[in-house]
Amino acid sequence: MTSILSGFIPAYWSNVFVRLQFLLLLVVMTMGCHHFSGNTVSGDVPSAADVQKIALIDSGSALFDSLRNGSLVYQFYHNNHFVPVWWEQNIPSARADSMLQLISNIREYGLLPQHYHSLELQKLLYDSAVADEYIIRKSDMLLTDAFIAICKDLKYGRRAFTEMDSDSVLRYVDSVALVNLTRTIKQNEIRSVLEEQEPKYGQYQMLKQELRKILRNDSLDAKAYLNGLVTDTTDLGAQIVSLEINMDRWRKESAISGRHILVNIPGGYLELTENDSVSFKSRVIVGTAKNQTPVLDGLIRSFIIYPYWNVPRSIAVNEILPQAKRDSLYLRNHHYEVLSPAGEVLHPDSINWMALHKNNFPYTIRQKEGLHNALGLIKFWFDNPYAVFLHDTNARLLFDRKKRALSHGCVRVEKAMELGRYLVRGNDIVSPEDLDQYLEFEKQMTIRITEPIPVHLRYLTCAWRDGAVEFYDDVYGADKEVFDRMYGEDPVIREDVQLAQGVRP
């Protein structure tokens, strides 16, 4: 029997021959219901009547088409001689009860029961009068598939592993899931094994704690929402969805660790973390919905005081060029210089501005250093494909606005000079006092940082700050995209249509 099934690949269940192989496997599993022990079941060849019976139960479709991890489920049972692991003497085991309870409460982990066969298991185990062999085998595999799926989702986030992932990555992901499943079955520790898969980030843990608090809320408003009686109660639905989406973002996080700078784009703030605590923070201004600040990682090795602003071409041709055509003094009044393709500074009067347009603009425009400069007095550069950086600004009143998605994409830092002083503390080359002295010279200078610091630009619409969870506007509409990807396009979740109305616009 094992040799017959050795070529089984669930991705090809639509193939009649392979489907028959899998049905034969089900018959083998129906030869007896044993506790997980490693005993090999009978190798008798099933009769045609047995195969026909299972095929009739299957009602013309593959019995396990709904499994997310069909190949792993098969591999697990193959490794364990096709012995059921969630049943004992035709009764769901205590392990099965624990797993079913976990699935019913999986919302507390930011996941949804519908993704883990909750409805099908409900029908099989609670709506059926008798637990026949079909119910035992199918429910056993559904529970196994649910465990593997939850294990993956907690460790890697709700994502689809695709052809873009390397074979080594896929093998590693699958091997980890199988090891955890085997350990769970042997040790009867479902919850602890699964919780080991979760991120250790403090932000994730605090969001999870807040979500659990809401879900366990005994208020009538909370119960009404969770029971589907209302779609949104005092923003409860939006908060639940935001918590779930951002917990999933932290599951996918891998770059943030140790000493680092985090910029939260929707939150409009910057935090510098050392030794697991925030030691510096500042308000920031980020890109508009049209000119979005990207999610990225970088490393700040130095910063520049009294920087030039090399105006991006899009701004030069779309904003500055029309002004220069209307006003011959515009460039001079705003301290702009015009550079030739060779980098030479040109006099504005030597240029025929009326002949220029976006397809004919061979010049570079830069703004001179000084208090008038749009970058302010300090610029923190780090390599990235978007030419985005952190900088000071001469428009400081904008920080008082609640909604601060106002820039062309770069991040304006309210306490930019304080950040510069902080980064040179203990610097072998330049001290904070030296920096203050250099600023008095009003000359451009590059300051090296002895200990370069990673910087992470992230999109988080809720976060734990100052002892409470804060919720932020979905300024770029990214939450809606994540929601559709996580829940909206999954046919299993269609019953939970109430949830979608909790998403912030």
Residue ranges of predicted features:
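N-terminal secretory signal peptides that target proteins for export/translocation
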Residues: 1-17
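Generic detection of long, well-ordered alpha-helical segments
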Residues: 17, 93, 133-144, 197, ...
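Sec-dependent signal peptide recognition
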Residues: 18-25
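Well-ordered beta-sheet/strand-loop patches within structured domains
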Residues: 34-72, 76-79, 148, 164-172, ...
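Cationic-aromatic interfacial patches
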Residues: 34-171
